Amino acid sequence: MKIHSSDHSWLLLAVLVILLSFSGALSSDDKEKKTKSVDKKKEVTYDGTSLIINGNRELLYSGSIHYPRSTPEMWPNIIKRAKQGGLNTIQTYVFWNVHEPEQGKFNFSGRADLVKFIKLIEKNGLYVTLRLGPFIQAEWTHGGLPYWLREVPGIFFRTDNEPFKEHTERYVKVVLDMMKEEKLFASQGGPIILGQIENEYSAVQRAYKEDGLNYIKWASKLVHSMDLGIPWVMCKQNDAPDPMINACNGRHCGDTFPGPNKDNKPSLWTENWTTQFRVFGDPPAQRSVEDIAYSVARFFSKNGTHVNYYMYHGGTNFGRTSAHYVTTRYYDDAPLDEFGLEREPKYGHLKHLHNALNLCKKALLWGQPRVEKPSNETEIRYYEQPGTKVCAAFLANNNTEAAEKIKFRGKEYLIPHRSISILPDCKTVVYNTGEIISHHTSRNFMKSKKANKNFDFKVFTESVPSKIKGDSFIPVELYGLTKDESDYGWYTTSFKIDDNDLSKKKGGKPNLRIASLGHALHVWLNGEYLGNGHGSHEEKSFVFQKPVTLKEGENHLTMLGVLTGFPDSGSYMEHRYTGPRSVSILGLGSGTLDLTEENKWGNKVGMEGERLGIHAEEGLKKVKWEKASGKEPGMTWYQTYFDAPESQSAAAIRMNGMGKGLIWVNGEGVGRYWMSFLSPLGQPTQIEYHIPRSFLKPKKNLLVIFEEEPNVKPELIDFVIVNRDTVCSYIGENYTPSVRHWTRKNDQVQAITDDVHLTANLKCSGTKKISAVEFASFGNPNGTCGNFTLGSCNAPVSKKVVEKYCLGKAECVIPVNKSTFEQDKKDSCPKVEKKLAVQVKCGRDKKN
């Protein structure tokens, strides 16, 4: 049929109107479905440069956040803050012993709701890296492997062992099939772009020889055979079999990583440790943000395109989930602290780094790399596309003590000691790893007024058994005895002493000697408490030895073996042993009496209070509680009630006056505490213990404590609210202005404003405002946030200037230059290079 041109135009118009009408008639749900269907599936591939998502090369900034270490109520805010910190990916382990604590019985609810966690990440527009295990280490009890696995006949963990492979394959398929059913893989339109099987296997591979290599090949084939449409990695595994990508773990992968084992694989950094995990008995340990930023900039300057901060938020080892001797608080010095609060300047300085690297994105992903070495201490690495304006440079000064000058393309740059300056156009410095522009915060633990009202502690003391029926001829190994059902295992034995044994010898009383493989031990003889002993994370074995008074006839020895978690690393974990190994009486008239193999031993697992569940409301009435006298022996349960701390700030309990034990709030396990194990500085490693708000009710919250040690003072315990309302700035007058002043447009770096200058930015959290300026000095002040002092040079008007810019505001910006702080245009110390130190207090408006 032939159509005239006028008719043709009319027909096109009619069709267009119909289509528009149809589109307008779609429901909002239909529109959403239509939008989602457009970009539903994502193809993830890779080459020697980067991961490629839907045909687009990506720079990936990832952070480790472990779902069981925070509560579902905390997840949204933590993920949101991670995104605001410049991350585009979240990495998590999958915890086998969380999901399958009993063989064949899976749990994916509450803090174990992996699907919910991943969907929240997806909702925030972030990618996911799923580190599947089966072994994860992670300072988590048993490295994430369930206890029951130890009791599978003929099993050897993490090697070419059929029972282990059989259970691993079953577990892996349960998890991956669940992810697939929920359409969470990128190939299905979900957020999971990368997977990991096994973890740092090279650390144990030599112990298993050929079986170790066979196991790694088997693990690789297992996940690739499931055809999930994502790449897979193995970290610290340089011989990772194709197509597996070998990735780096460590603090300085830009210098320590030998690179991918094939040219067609990208350089990925799966763990950049943001601090050092803590164990009981440790002094404080930190890693500076300057060092982290330096390491990341160096890695990206040397072909790296993916970094993961381990941890970005550490969280809490609730209940008994920490590995041996590891504190309840985990990676608290990460960019988001244990409570999910932004730890500044670590959070902000890394955010600025991500901004700077994004300005370099085109050059890093498509440019040709070049390297120049002006001196032994300096290095220039740059990427450019010939014939275009695309160019980015990294000027590195590796001198740890002094600044160095670097001449690049006709211009001289002064680079501070051990730092890297980033030039996203090969001309303009927008960021230096050693110059912190972001604000600082100091964390405050404020005693709660509501929660600390007249504690009325009641107590229940465990009976110490003198004789448990049993026929073992040696003390049973403690891991196998407790089976991860309790931290505690009782051991009893009896022995006879005659008059000849008690005859006086030079050297005084006989000595009881107990050699233990760990972790801690309490000892009674004939009902009298003799004391306790313990090992450490570095040296688990210890000896308990003490002079004792024996009686003629039968004597009764009772020992309580104590665990602080299962081991989380090493080869042959299924054969790792702990607990008392040899027991003897030295100095008897007849010589040494060996009780280890010549006596029958009785054993019992756990406390009566654990068996009855008296840590929760429904179990309280199963025992008789008495009013606390203040002279309780060890092995005592304490309970009281308290109201929730005021405000919605994070909450914690401070365990002053206590020794060692476990804490529950409303039946929820807060974790292990150990106040009596002091660091070399003479202080407990951890004092405050996080109580998530979701554990609390407005009133009458049940606090239950099991305390191992005698003579404690529970009246010294208090509840605190946690904030970061102390906000500071510490900026040198010659620092590089914030990267936020810059953007990239048409392959060029351009200033967002006409006036690019250095400023100090202070910001309160939430709806709070700056209520006081506690310190201000433009000169050469000393100290850190929360502890500043004046130096020899100080502009007298410093505090007045800061108050003018900041008081009563939620956020303020202070110009950092001489003209702002000069009085009558006079510089009282012109030869001093100035720094501005400011400390303010944030608070809520009293009217509110």
UniProtKB/Swiss-Prot annotation:
GO biological process: carbohydrate metabolic process
InterPro entries to which the protein is assigned, alphabetical: BetaGal_gal-bd, Galactose-bd-like_sf, GHD, Gly_Hdrlase_35_cat, Glyco_hydro_35_CS, Glycoside_Hdrlase_35, Glycoside_hydrolase_SF, Lectin_gal-bd_dom
Signal peptide: 1-27
Residues annotated as the enzyme's active site: 200 (proton donor), 271 (nucleophile)
GO molecular function annotations of the record: beta-galactosidase activity; carbohydrate binding
Domain SUEL-type lectin residues, every copy: 754-843
Ranges annotated as spanning the membrane: none
One cellular component (GO) term of this entry: apoplast
Sugar-modified residues: 107, 272, 303, 376, 398, 782, 787, 817
Protein name: Beta-galactosidase 13
